[in-house]
Each structure stands twice: as structure tokens, then as C-alpha cells.
Amino acid sequence: GSGKTEISKLIKKFISHKFGKTLIINGDDIRDIFDIKKYDREDRLKLGKKYTLLAKHITDQNINVIFAVAGLFDDLRKYNRKIINNYVEIFIKSDLARIVSHKKKPLYKKKNVGKIWGINLKPEFPKKPDITIENDFTIPLKRLANNLKKEIEKKFN
């Protein structure tokens, strides 16, 4: 809803050129591939740890991973930093009300009551992300992606 996947697609070529082979993994795609339907806190934590192990497995083969997921828990972010070399956390900050009003994702429909972070599940927003990009839906995603590229350049130069 915040633009994670689209921004990931827009920066992939830049990351590949600058840092080598790069793969985008979208959390929704992983859920679809493995038919994962549970969204409660416990299951999200378990899945998050699996995402981390998958990312580590790929990065250990010298392939960069852009993992487009909602990182909801401080414990998972700490785990990511501990397990993954060169881990960079990018927080796309968005207002939930705007996400819901702009998006037509099935997750935000009434049938999913009780499963939506920020509405029924309290997220733990990152306290110290490496990079923060604000998406208030007034700036085109292409420009946000360009801003992110500049921030990545600053971080690695």
C-alpha cells in the first residue's frame, strides 16, 4: 500500500548497476506462492524470520535482495541486522488512512477485519531505519525512487 513494490522495481536497475546482481522479493508474492493465509502477529513473526533466512541464503551467494515487505516488528529488524551482512533498512513512511483511500488491495477489504497492521495489529515502526522516504501520495513514485537512489548513494559513498 505504501509503494514498496513499485519503488523496489524503480530502483532495481540502479542497485544492480552499482552493487551487482539484484533480486526483488515481494512479501505478497511469497504469501501467494506458498499459499500463506495467516496474518496474526505470531504467524507474521514466523514468516518474517523465514524471509530473513531466505534473504541471507540469497545474499550469501553475492546477490543483493530488495525485500519489499512491511517490517512490522522491532525484534525482526534486530534479527535482520544480526543475520544479514550489509543489511540496509529503508522505511517508506505513509499515513494508513491515505493508503486505505488510495489502494484497492484485497487486504484492506472488510473480509480481512482483524488482520490489517495499523488497524487491528499494532505495528512497531522503525526507530532507526538507515533511510526514510515519506510517501504522502502527492509525489510520483518515480521521483520518490530517485530520492531513494540519492540517499543510497550518500550512504555508500
Region annotations inferred by a language model:
Residues T5:
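Walker A/P-loop
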Residues D29-R31, G71-D74, K93-R98, T138-I139:
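Conserved nucleotide-binding/hydrolysis micro-motifs of P-loop NTPases
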Residues S8-L53:
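Conserved substrate/cofactor phosphate-moiety recognition/catalytic segment
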Residues I66-A68, I83-H102, I133:
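Conserved phosphate-donor/acceptor-positioning beta-strand/loop module used by diverse small-molecule
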Residues T52-I63:
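Inter-motif core of Ras-like GTPase G domains
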Residues L23-G27, Q61-A70:
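Short beta-strand segments at enzyme active-site cores
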Residues S2:
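ATP-binding Walker
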Residues K93, S101-N157:
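Small-molecule kinase domains that catalyze NTP-dependent phosphoryl transfer to phosphate-bearing small molecules
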